[in-house]
Each structure stands twice: as C-alpha cells, then as structure tokens.
Amino acid sequence: MLNYVLKRLLGLIPTLLIVAVLVFLFVHLLPGDPARLIAGPEADAQVIALVRQQLGLDQPLHVQFWHYITHVLQGDFGTSMVSRRPVSEEIASRFLPTLWLTITSMIWAVLFGMAIGIAAAVWRNRWPDRLGMTLAVTGISFPAFALGMLLMQIFSVDLGWLPTVGADSWQHYILPSLTLGAAVASVMARFTRSSFVDVLSEDYMRTARAKGVSETWVVLKHGLRNAMIPVVTMMGLQFGFLLGGSIVVEKVFNWPGLGRLLVDSVDMRDYPVIQAEVLLFSLEFILINLVVDVLYAAINPAIRYK
C-alpha cells in the first residue's frame, strides 16, 4: 500500500507539469490585453506599453514561460497583476471560505443522497422509489444559479429568515450549501440506488435473510459495505467538483471564495492568479482520487494494492 501511494504521489509531478504548460498557453490565448485593462480606458499607448513592461508581457512567450515555470517549481506563483499582492496570499485568503462551503454542502448532500438512494433501492418500484428518483432528476436538471436565486427570493427577500450575501456566520452557509449540494445529493441518490439494487440481489444477502437476520441489519451490515465501493468513487469525484466547481454559486451569493476570485481574475486577465488556481484545482482532483483509492482497501479488505 505504501509503495502504491508513493508511486501515485510521484506521478503528480508530470501531470502537474503538463497542466502548467496547458494553462499557461490557455491564458495567453484569451482575448484582451491585461495591460490595457489595468491601465484603464483613458490610458494612451505609452502608458499601456509601460504597464506591459512592468508586468513582463513585453517579453517573448517562451521567456515568459521559462520565468513562470522556474518560479512555480520554487513555490512562487508570482504577484497578482490587479491587487499587486502575492498570489499565494490571494488564494490563502479565499481558500477557507470555499473549503468550509464545500464540506458543508458535501455532508448534507451525502447524508440525504445516500438515504434517498437506499430507501429507493429497498422499496424499488414503489412510491419511495418513484418519489426519490423524481426528486433526484429534478435536482440534477435544475440550474444552480436559478435554484440559488429562488432560495434567496423565498428565504431572504420574502421571509427574511436568512442573509443573502457574505460568509460571516453559520447562517450565511445555509443557502449557498443547499444550492451547491442539490445536484450532488441527486447524483448520490441515483448512484446509491443503482449500486444497492445490484447488491440486494447477491447470494450473500439472501443467505443472511435465510439465517433470520433482520432486514435492517442485512441492509446496513452486509449491503452497505459492498454497495459503498462504487459510491465512494462518485463521492470523491463530487467532492472535487464542489471544491473546484462552485464558481456560479459563489457569484450568485457574492461568496468570498476561490470561484469568485477565478471569475474576477478571468475578467481582468490576471494571468498569475488564473494559472495558480487551475493548478490548485488539478492538484485537488488528483489527491482526492488518491484518497478514494486508499479508502477502497479500508471499506473492502479484499482489495489490496501492490
């Protein structure tokens, strides 16, 4: 197991290097001149040229890339073109709000999604199954921005129960986490149902019932462990989606997180921040997949990595 983990960690290096090259080329192909955006609409050509020189954008592309990659390998992601603050500080100040929002969304999405999926599988083709899958399809189909605006209209504007924007108290997390986790809960419900339906028809489940074990214990002890293996894979992918895909929700609720920072950086063509955020999101997905693979062995001891 240890050798497997070490090999996967070493495999991070070429993957992140490829991502670094691709994101560098991507941001430099974006239309628009960051020097012109920073200098302002009233700036003349001389001022824009001076700003471009200060930002290092007047150098050839290969020189810019060499400067970028050598600094990244040293852990230096540069300075934001807009705020003139180190990129690491910009990301650090926005990381925790996004992380806590992701964790909050993931907790309720997994609990409710798995509960609905298990109930739908146990009472398959009956009203709990139909109701649960109807809710799941609705949650997947409903756009996140529309759901967020609907929740804000009802609970913030009409009823006045919850705040609309900000991240100062636990109440600020309710509406964004519900909006962000709705699609994940729906996916988890459908995936859990599919996995449980397959497990419930296995021989060891029938054997446990024949021995007189209660249905609840059969489902929780014998069914849950075996059904969780594919569900854990989806759980890891969805966690990565939440952590890196909260851009729309953060924009709707004016959430001070990484998603909103990325949108603002793309608008201003803030190359260093865009590059650092994409690298961070890539690293998160790779590490989450590694954790999921390791959890396989914990859930099912029959699985071993060599």
Curated annotation (Swiss-Prot):
Residues 30-102, 156-168, 250-278 are periplasmic. The keyword Transport applies. Pfam families: BPD_transp_1, BPD_transp_1_N. The keyword Cell inner membrane applies. Keywords: Cell inner membrane, Cell membrane, Membrane, Transmembrane, Transmembrane helix, Transport. Coiled coil: none annotated. It is a multi-pass membrane protein. GO terms for cellular component: plasma membrane. The chain crosses the membrane at residues 9-29, 103-123, 135-155, 169-189, 229-249, 279-299. InterPro entries: BPD_transp_1_N, MetI-like, MetI-like_sf. Gene3D superfamilies: MetI-like. Residues 1-8, 124-134, 190-228, 300-306 are cytoplasmic. One of its GO terms (biological process) is transmembrane transport. Residues 95-292 form the ABC transmembrane type-1 domain. It is found in: Cell inner membrane. Belongs to the binding-protein-dependent transport system permease family. The complex is composed of two ATP-binding proteins (GsiA), two transmembrane proteins (GsiC and GsiD) and a solute-binding protein (GsiB). Part of the ABC transporter complex GsiABCD involved in glutathione import. Probably responsible for the translocation of the substrate across the membrane. This is Glutathione transport system permease protein GsiC. It comes from Salmonella typhimurium (strain LT2 / SGSC1412 / ATCC 700720).
